[in-house]
């Protein structure tokens, strides 16, 4: 592990008197991050509705351009990773001296995650949307590694939950045992090594004839987003930077992301089917998402905080977990109805049909997530105060 010290003195400027009229950057409740959750989950829905399994050759060039742009929606998962790394690391650092540190964390995480997750697995089995071996591996938090067991990923959204669970299993011990600066060193190591592991995985997959995109689901190839978010959480707590310093950092990260894209463009950085893209494609996005979180925190703690908050997006953020889990089941259900002729008498242009399908997907997914949250998840989550 490389030796590292947080260069707080180099990065920081003295806190200005004007900083005092703002709220603290880190607060018990940060609604602006819920807005980002809402954006992230809507990105994923747009990706699945307009790009995933769509034959782009069937559309005119202008419409094809829009559908191609919908590809970026899959990056909503990476935004979730950076957010999770930031929030979970902050939570763990702030509570690491508690005697009930492990008990409190794992009970609360279990109450939050398991109800909707287990319901999803039951529904997958009930409607025969996934084979038993995939469901069992998913229940063991191995949904992202099922290809290593010779089992296809039958319900793709579960891969990212597996990555998150692996993070939850390992990270509390790391935070508990190490100093903040040592945690930062771990994060920097992960960010530095992840492109190398992706590149190695890319060549191994190509040599063995595996489906190349599945390698990006493996935990060791996705951990740098979590590490980037964790590094921001440590930086804000260890260095206590001024608002001006945070603004400079966000700007620096955006510039760095643009430089990586510019330099990598001739080498295929936007294609995961090429070595440079496989290794580095997600890196500038991770930097950009860290900058986005930093900017949101600045705006959310300023007198103009209302600009960082959207009631609609916060609502989507509140139900983002259920939306993410259930939406693909609903999309597959709409596909099943279409295949069996339920929409045979509806004659819409193909592109308009995609928008109608998206409207149905969004409405039904919101309904399912809201009902799940109100009648399943929240009643169980209320047990956390009794059990911890």
Q: What are these regions, as identified by a protein language model?
A:
Residues 137-142:
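Short helix- or helix-capping micro-motifs
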Residues 4-32, 42-71, 88-100, 126, ...:
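Alpha-helical transmembrane segments in multi-pass integral membrane proteins
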Residues 121, 168-177, 181-192:
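Hydrophobic, aromatic-rich transmembrane alpha-helices
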Residues 37, 85, 110, 164, ...:
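Divalent metal-coordination and catalytic microenvironments
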Residues 80-81, 86-90, 109-134, 332:
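Specific transmembrane helices
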Residues 151-173:
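Function-critical hydrophobic alpha-helical transmembrane segments in multi-pass membrane proteins
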Residues 34, 38-41, 77, 84, ...:
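Residues within membrane-spanning alpha-helices of integral membrane proteins
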Residues 34, 105, 157-162, 324:
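Short alpha-helical catalytic segment bearing the HExxH-like zincin motif
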């Amino acid at each position: 592990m490389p030796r590292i010290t947080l260069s707080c003195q180099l990065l920081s400027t003295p806190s200005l008197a004007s900083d005092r009229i703002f709220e603290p950057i880190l607060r018990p409740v940060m609604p602006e991050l819920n807005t980002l959750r809402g954006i992230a989950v809507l990105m994923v829905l747009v990706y699945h509705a307009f790009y995933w399994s769509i034959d782009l050759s069937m559309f005119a060039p202008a419409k094809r351009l829009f559908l191609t742009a919908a590809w970026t929606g899959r990056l909503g998962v990476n935004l979730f990773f950076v957010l999770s790394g930031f929030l979970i690391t902050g939570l763990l650092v702030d509570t690491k001296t508690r005697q009930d540190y492990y008990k409190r964390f794992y009970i609360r995480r279990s109450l939050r995650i398991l109800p909707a997750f287990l319901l999803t697995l039951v529904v997958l089995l009930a409607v025969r949307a996934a084979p038993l071996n995939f469901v069992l591996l998913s229940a063991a938090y191995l949904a992202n590694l099922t290809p290593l067991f010779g089992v296809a990923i039958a319900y793709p959204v579960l891969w990212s939950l597996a990555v998150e669970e692996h993070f939850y299993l390992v990270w509390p011990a790391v935070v508990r045992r190490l100093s903040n600066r040592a945690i930062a060193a771990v994060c920097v190591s992960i960010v530095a090594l992840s492109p190398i592991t992706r590149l190695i995985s890319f060549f191994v997959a190509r040599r063995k004839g595996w489906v190349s995109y599945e390698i990006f689901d493996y935990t060791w190839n996705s951990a740098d987003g979590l590490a980037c978010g964790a590094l921001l959480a440590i930086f804000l707590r260890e260095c206590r930077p001024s608002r001006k310093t945070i603004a400079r950092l966000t700007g620096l990260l955006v510039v760095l992301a643009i430089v990586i894209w510019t330099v990598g463009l001739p080498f295929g950085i936007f294609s995961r089917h090429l070595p440079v893209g496989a290794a580095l494609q997600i890196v500038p996005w991770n930097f950009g998402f860290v900058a986005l979180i930093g900017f949101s925190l600045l705006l959310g703690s300023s007198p103009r905080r209302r600009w960082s908050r959207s009631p609609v997006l916060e609502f989507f953020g509140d139900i983002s977990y259920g939306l993410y889990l259930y939406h693909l089941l609903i999309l597959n259900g709409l596909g099943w109805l279409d295949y069996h002729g339920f929409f045979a008498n509806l004659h819409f242009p193909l592109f308009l049909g995609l928008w109608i399908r998206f409207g149905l997907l969004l409405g039904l997914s919101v309904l399912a997530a809201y009902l799940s949250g109100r009648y399943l998840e929240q009643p169980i989550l209320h047990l956390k105060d009794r059990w911890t």
